[in-house]
Regions:
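N-terminal nucleotide-binding beta1-loop-alpha1 segment
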Residues: 1-19
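Conserved N-terminal catalytic core of the sugar/cofactor nucleotidyltransferase
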Residues: 3, 7, 31-93, 106, ...
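Active-site acidic Asp-centered loop
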Residues: 97-99
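Acidic metal-phosphate-binding loop of nucleotide-sugar-dependent transferases
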Residues: 101-103
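C-terminal catalytic/acceptor-binding lobe
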Residues: 210, 214-218, 240-260
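Short, conserved phosphate/pyrophosphate- and ester-handling motifs at nucleotide-, phospho-/glycolipid
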Residues: 235
Length: 260
């Protein structure tokens, strides 16, 4: 079974490049950042069709001719997700991903999709161990959360049943809006969960259970050794690290750890 993919390419890129009209157009190693993501999805075996959601289609470039669908939506996070999912027939799972993970590979995508489908869950979220992240992306400045099994960072994608998306627009918007405010998030997902998270006592099973409760379905979390899934570009140092990794791949050399 294959899945469809929605890439959310909007967002403010001005914090990195003031001339960037939206985040997906940020130049990384000679290409717009979202182009790296879209091309990896196009080449992945487990992806049927790709829809890239952008705030405007102006100036995207010729690369879009090789991508399935371009969806113009400049609304809220939830609005953009719904617009992207609406580009498909709704007959299979959808891989939601951000457009700011330029080092993503077809192999990483295929592995996550296969693992996710094997769980049979309605929504599946990837976890990357700290050691894997720092090994593949030396010099990376990520935020890690300590689970009972050790420090992890979350991936920038989710495999989900489109019916779950449509039924959870309100809660999805609230979680996204509070994602950087632990107190506000606690009001949405529960204080006990947040406290256990902050204390490093949460288990993966608890994460899965909470995800299922929030969406009114079944949730799962899977570990991936493909750290590119969690290597988003949010600040200038992330650009340096991503370009170093991409250059190292193209030359067959290991990336060094010195961020400039």
């Amino acid at each position: 079974m294959t899945v469809d993919a929605v890439v959310l390419a909007g967002g403010d890129g001005a914090v990195i490049d003031p001339s960037c009209r939206f985040k997906g157009l940020l130049p990384i190693a000679g290409k717009p950042m979202v182009q790296w993501v879209a091309e990896a999805l196009r080449d992945a075996e487990m992806i049927r069709e790709v829809a890239v959601v952008v705030p405007t289609a102006e100036g995207l470039g010729a690369w879009v001719d090789d991508i399935g669908k371009i969806v113009v939506s400049d609304g809220s996070f939830v609005d953009n997700v719904v617009a992207g999912v609406g580009a498909f027939r709704g007959d299979r799972r959808v891989l939601l991903t951000t457009g700011d993970i330029p080092a993503i590979t077809p192999a990483a995508l295929d592995d996550f999709v296969r693992q996710s489908l094997d769980t049979g869950a309605d929504a599946v979220y990837p976890l990357v161990r700290k050691d894997d992240m720092l090994s593949e992306f030396p010099g990376s400045e990520r935020t890690f959360v300590r689970l009972a099994t050790g420090p992890v960072t979350g991936g920038n994608m989710m495999l989900i049943d489109p019916e779950i998306i449509m039924a959870n627009q309100e809660i999805g918007g609230r979680i996204f809006a509070t994602r950087k405010n632990p107190v506000a998030m606690a009001r949405v997902i529960g204080m006990r969960f947040v406290v256990r998270l902050l204390l490093g006592r949460l288990t993966v099973v608890e994460v899965e259970r909470k995800l299922g409760q929030l969406i009114g379905g079944t949730g799962a979390a899977v570990y991936t050794t493909h750290a590119s899934i969690g290597a988003d570009v949010d600040k200038p140092v992330d650009v340096v690290v991503a370009e170093r990794v991409l250059y190292a791949r193209s030359t067959g050399r290991a990336p060094d750890s010195q961020a400039e």
